[in-house]
Amino acid sequence: MPKLSQQAPLVSSGSGVIASQTFADLIRAALRDILLHRLDLPALVGHLTGIFGLSSNESFVITPVSTNVATGLVAATAKAVGKTGSVDNEIMEAVALAGSRGTSARTHDSKIAIIGMSGRFPEAADLDSFWSLLVQGVDAYRPVAPDRFDAHAHYDETGRRKNTSKVLGGCWINQPGLFDPKFFSISPKEAEQSDPAQRLALQTAYEALEMAGMVPDRTQSTQRERVGVFYGMFTQGGIRAFTPGRINYHFKFSGPSITVDTACSSSLAAIHVACNSLWRGDCDTAVAGGVNVLTNPDIFAGLDRGHFLSTTGNCKTFDDDADGYCRADGVGTVILKRLEDAIMDKDPILAVLNSAYTNHSAEAVSITRPHAGAQELIFSKLLRETGIHPHDVSYIEMHGTGTQAGDATEMSSVLRTFAPDTGRLSNQTLHLGSAKSNVGHGESASGVTSLIKVLLMMKHNTIPPHCGIKGRINHRFPTDLRERNVFIASQPVAWDKPHSGSGKRRVFINNFSAAGGNSALLLEDAPTRQHPETKDPRSTHIVAVSAKSSTALVNNLKRLKVFVQDNIHNLDLLAKLSYTTTARRIHYPFRAAITASSSDQLLQGIESILLRDESTKPATSQKNIGFVFSGQGAQYAGMGRHLFQNNETFRTQVLACNQICLSQGFPSILDIFNQGVEMNNLEPLVVQLGTTCLQMSLVSFWKSLGVTPDFCIGHSLGEYAALQAAGVLSVSDTIYLTGIRARLLQKKCSAGSHAMLAVRAPLAQVHGFFNPSIHEVTCLNSPHDVAIGGLVADIEDLERELAENNIEAVKVSVPFAFHSTQVEPILDEFCAAAESVQFQTQRIPVISTLLGEVVLPEAKAVFGPEYLKRHCREPVNFTAAAQAGKDANIINSASVFIEIGPHTVCSALLKSNIGPNAVTLPSLHRKDDGWKVLADTLAGLYHSGLRINWDEFHRDFESCQEVLQLPSYCWDNKNYWIQYVHNWTLTKGDPPATTAQTPALELPENSTSSVQKVIQQTDGPGPFVTIVVQSDFGSPRLAEVAEGHKVNGEMLCTSSLYAEIGMTLGRQLLEKYRPDLQGYSTEIEDMSVDKPLILKEKNKETLFRAEVVHDKSTLTAAMSIYSVDSAGKKTVDHAHCILRFADPKSWLDEWERTYYSIERSVRWLEARVEQGTDSLLSKGIVYKLFSSLVDYSPSFKGLQEVILNSSDREATAKVRLQAEKEDFDYNPMWIDSFGQLTGFLMNGHDFTEKDQVFINHGWRSMRCAKQFRKDAVYRTYICMQNVDKTKYCGDLYIIEDGVIIAVFGGMTVLPPRRGADAIHTPNPVAAAPAGLVASTKAHVRRPLDIPTRAQRQASSPQSGAIHRILVILAEEVGLSLETLTDDLVFADYGVDSLLSLTITGRIREELDLDVDSSTFTNCSTLGELRLFLAADQKLDDAVACESSNGQHTPQTSDKGSGTLTAQKPDHDTDSEMTLNRVCAIIAEEVGISVEELSSSQDFQELGIDSLSALTILSRVREELQLDLESDFFDTHPSFYSLQKTLRGTEGASNRTLEPNGAIPSRHDLKSDLGNIEWQSGQNIVASAPHATSILVSGSPSTARMILVLFPDGSGSAASYGALAPKIRKDIAVYALNCPWRTNGEEILRLGVSLDQMVAKHLIEVRRILDNHQQSRLNGSIDLALGGWSAGGILAIEGVRQLRQTGIVVQKLVLLDAPNPIGLQNPPPRMFHFLDELGILGAGTGKAPTWVLQHFDAMVNLLKSYRPRPLSAESAPKSLIVYAKDGVCKDPKGPQMDTKPDDAREMLWLLYDRVDFSAEGWKSLVGQQNLVVGVVEDVNHFSMMNPGPKIIEMSNLIGDFLLGLN
């Protein structure tokens, strides 16, 4: 053994200095110390003191290797030796980092990088305001926010009153309802109904991802399938799984989706789970956080009863008077990655998470009490695992709830671990704090709130003051905190990184929960970023900004402008800003791109865009990219040099081409990239080869950026590179052909003997100077550009002659006259050389400039040696090529051209051929800086909507690759908030009231002259409000109304009085019961007068009542008016209508667009008076003529003058209202005065028969946006249309001071014969469908000149039916009508398959129109839907009775004087009405206004999926009688395609829509079911939620039978979306939705039985049945029930229950329903097996959680259900259709492990069936009543999928129902 040469002393940790002489001795000593001796630190300190004491240095450094004693050792030694000591952890960190950079198998060793964060906090809507709040020490406590609940109503100082608390305040997020649903493709209606915490989680997740610069799928660690989402959420009442689920769904992440509930520590526990997922390799990126939004007082009461909450204010953390915690809102999100992935992806690392851990305080004295030992265990574990000494931790963010027990326990555990004594050095201070003292306790969001606070502290290098100590510090804390170097900041404290040791700050974050859980994180600073020495060489940069709306884009630009102004002196700003805004952002359709070489120039560019408002139109990605390859004559030295020097892709391709050139014997081409070379000194071979290689390298460059050509066109030499880009030639062959041709030219042709002349003139003009014997046309470049070839002398002579005639001509800088006789010597040899080249089939179209044709890939071989031979000799016909491209639609308005060449030669030619608007973009430019050219071109491509690979663009410039912390996305937020009302939590647990509750604020007993006495006023059950009022028609004031309106001597009640009563009651309903509808007005819809109310004698008591029923979950109420006797018993029904509540501003906005057409019609009538065609009738004449029909009192005589056009049934009048007492809301005499024009028009025109009188039978809608004034002068206008024999309809417009203020829409008159009998027994008229809003527009004169299509579209108004559909759509989605525009994308507003079903179902039911639910799949925008509807004649025929069918536009004189010439107008086609109606349905279902729909949008962006499409089509079918295919939205995905289809639809049915009766409310129907056996559970049946239905197929007005399908185990009507539309159209098919479709757990919680479940569905069935019977003349219709799977069992129970109420079900349809006798329900594992196969997810993957929950609930219901046989008289004829196959039919496919004793129904589902006897069903309905059908090649689930088998099954069903089989 050699002796050791001691370079440094070796010190033993046990025995002291080692004096070993040999290596063997040293090893023995080391082993003894390791295995035998104890660690003796005092001895070690003594030895080190001796060594360091001999040194002259004033400081020493200890470097630990795999030990954590270094910090303590330094402290003790420094004290002993009197010198400064420090720890250098470089070795340990290097080892840790090296380990973290290992393979994926080593992910468990990785540190976790935090790369993004965002949040919403009390009084702080963003991170900046949160930091401002923290650093200023703000206490955010305030009284309960008024948008949450009435704090005083739920407050009880004594704490004794049930469901109250002693808390009056908290910490609140301002406006937590703010959300941008369109951005996330959620409908406004769905947004309002979703948990606000989910919405804020979505927005903060996006903002955090944006801060992280995360673009999904950009790198290996950001692949969507490798991103997980983890959130903490504990508050009951929300569906917690949907919080991460919504985020995953929006971003299409498919990694783990987990909600963690550990009460107060939920968010930190969720972050721990996220870290574990990263360490385990389950995901590569994690979105983690927590949410807490306090929406009601419920939990306040419980927590207060548990003594958790402070009653005196905010959390007084560390204060001696701490008395509990303060509840708070909070939402926070962070983005996590493994450190090595974050470094590799150049992510902005905010901090590094060293470790995380969670445990439980099992040894605590109470589950809610923290345990110091458990907390210490976490601290020690994390320190030990990370090798960090406790003294290295400089800040601890405490949980700090402000409870006495919690604060003291936490302080004890922290101090015992991190500062047990005074061992911390002076530079090892430890600060403590808690965010809860500022923003309260966010409960499940508290941990992430603390984490974000710490991240902000690191960013700002400041410890904010702690504001929790209001008086004195907690007396339980140790008094020597300062001696321990522990501080609680009272002012902001600088917090810099340590200069010694690791140079990193270490932080602990502690979080524990009321349920006993403890979670903690150990953080440190991010690693220092290494800045490359090389600067970014690019002189010009591109900055991109995008948004999903124009307003968001403008606001994003404004925010960016402020950011640039604040950072304008940052020298690297522009390059890094370019990288951040391009490569590290998700890009959206509304775009702006600015190119700039300085920050000032960038600011100018932003300002220019904002001033020009260039952001209003979205870009589309459907662009047609053309690569245009220029020829010769534009080459210059150094072309492409900037790319050659700085872009690896371009340079690699150039060098590869150069190598091929050399290998083929050609010279090097690299000289052309040298600016110092003279081009004239390069031989043509080098120039031509170099040009072609340059072009091929540019193609590679563009392709690397994701820009690939859709077609190519090459000019002359450029066609070689074009053929290579199209795949015809390889790179090698392209070089070979170019080189051979150039070499032959040099060899066989004399350079400089010939020349080419570019002439700027048409060929015909040039021919005058052209000599064919010496001149040749070589290029036809454009209609005004030609090139001539010939000998130099001849060309110079021609140039001179042209100049003398002022024709521009320039010699082309080329050595040869290409495409002329000069090249003929090389042709044969060149052709022979080309024979060796293999010409491949092209991949994309090539526009040949030789042939002037488009050569498509499928064309037979065109390119070959002979082609190239001709190409060399024959002229270039660029003009013909461009025209051919246009003719073939290869070149169109969507085309974007990129010139592939050294200069913009072809760009000008393209504009000359195609037009100046052609988008042409250069790759290079002779005069301009290359980087500027490239930036401008990329900006152009970006504006065009192209998806660019920005990472590749920036890849070679490392210095710019830093993600800047830019302002976050600027949302188009609106407030979606459901107000907590009626203080319902106060009565939780109370016994159900035996009578309905009466609200505290009752209607006044004498409200108005028309509403005289309140008879009944109830709020309940459920959402229903009922008001019954009584009035005396013989009372003095109403007798005046009656006496002033005598018909044939009878004092008849005018319908205007009914309208006044409706508006009065509507106002009172809004005031008392709907404070959420402040500012709304009441519209009177579908007023139908059945029998007149007549006052027999003046002053004789004539009692009548008005009854209003309102469902508070809707915007409508039903009103009926009927006479009663003195005992209050109903005697005669007089009228009924619908009250609809709406914002009158939306009416005014709609009418404003109509006013122009109405005003022109009035002027047209006035012109007819001037021409003598029509007469102006005075007031006296009008009422004299009227007197033969109606005897009006002066109060009714408001008409001052009338212009009557009898032939067109059109009139206008001036109205001055008579002075009246103001004792009505809307004076009925004034309303009648306006409406009299209708009666006068119809009874005074030339075609009225002598014995006819037209009587008003109601109207479709009456909307009054403003109060009428007695001193105002009004103008009215109406045009009546014959819709059915003697029935006429029209809209009356009321105008004041140039503004339409009211519209009486769809006024209907019918002509009973004259006489008193006609009055007493008028023809009954059914009411229009309930629940509609419609507004037709009047006719406007059309000019004599045939208008353009654009003019027709511009002047075409919405029809009434369109508007009614829009209202339905707006209601279902949750938008106002004014927000419905054509560019509205249904997918943006959450119109999914279910919502589509709902909308189309309402259209069918309310408008009697058959619209397929797939309309919303085929029509992706409202604009497309409008066009679709406009094309369908069937729609217009169906609603012809409702409105005028077009508009007229006045004829103006040719001289433009404006003089009106009376011309009989043309009517617009009815297709526009159809389109408008469908648009209205879409808008209502999506939840936006019609105006928001646009042809530029895709329906999917509105949120329209298969289910919402079904809903929309259902409503179109029912309301418009328009039958669209169920896949309509699949085949019409955009508004344009829908518009085109609807406007082109012909052959529609000519049937007329007959108005239906009023739809009974659920409140009416419940009483009819009261004698059913489930009466004991009647509260469950009667209360909300309610079953809903969707009319999936058929029409109410034409149906011969109704089939109602009960939901299967999923609870969704969507299961029948494919089947129902295939069933015969004379069967109205309804599908039911379970009331608890998305909340199956409630079924179990409430203990719902199957009987009760069915009874809830039957309320909806009764409503459907009554609606159909009222709409039919014969008053009855056959009913069939049915169901698939478990739905069949529900259906037969429905048959039994309906029979008990006297309703007979004629037919029963069972679709693969399991045997109900002895039912053995499948176990949950089967459903999970099916879910894994994707069966339960309807082809979209795994089923949502709510589907599985509903399945579980149904299994439990069926388990306890015992079916009872039906009696012989009640058993319907029944059909059961079985699927023959089992799910596991394929032996090679997935199989489930089963046993013979497994559940019968499980085996029945999985394996092929052999028994089709249906014995169980026969025992219930009788063998004689049952028909069995079998469908082969389908299983239980696939039988419901689209395809031929579903048509087979639908035929079986249809034939059975109609008795055809």
UniProtKB/Swiss-Prot annotation:
Residues 109-525 form the Ketosynthase family 3 (KS3) domain. Residues 1356-1433, 1472-1546 form the Carrier domain. GO terms for molecular function: 3-oxoacyl-[acyl-carrier-protein] synthase activity; fatty acid synthase activity; phosphopantetheine binding. It comes from the Eukaryota. Residues 1012-1146 are annotated as: N-terminal hotdog fold. Residues 1582-1855 are annotated as: Thioesterase (TE) domain. Residues 1442-1462 have a biased composition (Polar residues). Residues 626-931 are annotated as: Malonyl-CoA:ACP transacylase (MAT) domain. Induction: Expression is up-regulated in appressoria-forming germlings on locust cuticle. Expression is also up-regulated during conidiation. InterPro entries: AB_hydrolase_fold, Ac_transferase_dom_sf, ACP-like_sf, Acyl_transferase_dom, Acyl_Trfase/lysoPLipase, Ketoacyl_synth_AS, Ketoacyl_synth_C, Ketoacyl_synth_N. It is an enzyme of class 2 (transferase). Residues 1008-1312 are annotated as: Product template (PT) domain. Residues 1441-1470 are annotated as: Disordered. Its EC number is 2.3.1.-. The active site is at C264 (for beta-ketoacyl synthase activity), H399 (for beta-ketoacyl synthase activity), H441 (for beta-ketoacyl synthase activity), S716 (for acyl/malonyl transferase activity), H1045 (proton acceptor), D1232 (proton donor), S1685 (for thioesterase activity). The modification O-(pantetheine 4'-phosphoryl)serine is found at S1393, S1506. SUPFAM superfamilies: ACP-like, alpha/beta-Hydrolases, FabD/lysophospholipase-like, Thiolase-like. Residues 1174-1318 are annotated as: C-terminal hotdog fold. Keywords: Multifunctional enzyme, Phosphopantetheine, Phosphoprotein, Repeat, Transferase. CDD domains: PKS (cd00833). Residues 1012-1318 form the PKS/mFAS DH domain. Multidomain protein; including a ketosynthase (KS) that catalyzes repeated decarboxylative condensation to elongate the polyketide backbone; a malonyl-CoA:ACP transacylase (MAT) that selects and transfers the extender unit malonyl-CoA; a product template (PT) domain that controls the immediate cyclization regioselectivity of the reactive polyketide backbone; and an acyl-carrier protein (ACP) that serves as the tether of the growing and completed polyketide via its phosphopantetheinyl arm. Lacks the starter unit:ACP transacylase (SAT) that selects the starter unit. Polyketide synthase; part of the Pks2 gene cluster that mediates the formation of infectious structures (appressoria), enabling these fungi to kill insects faster. The product of the Pks2 gene cluster is different from the one of Pks1 and has still not been identified. This is Polyketide synthase 2.
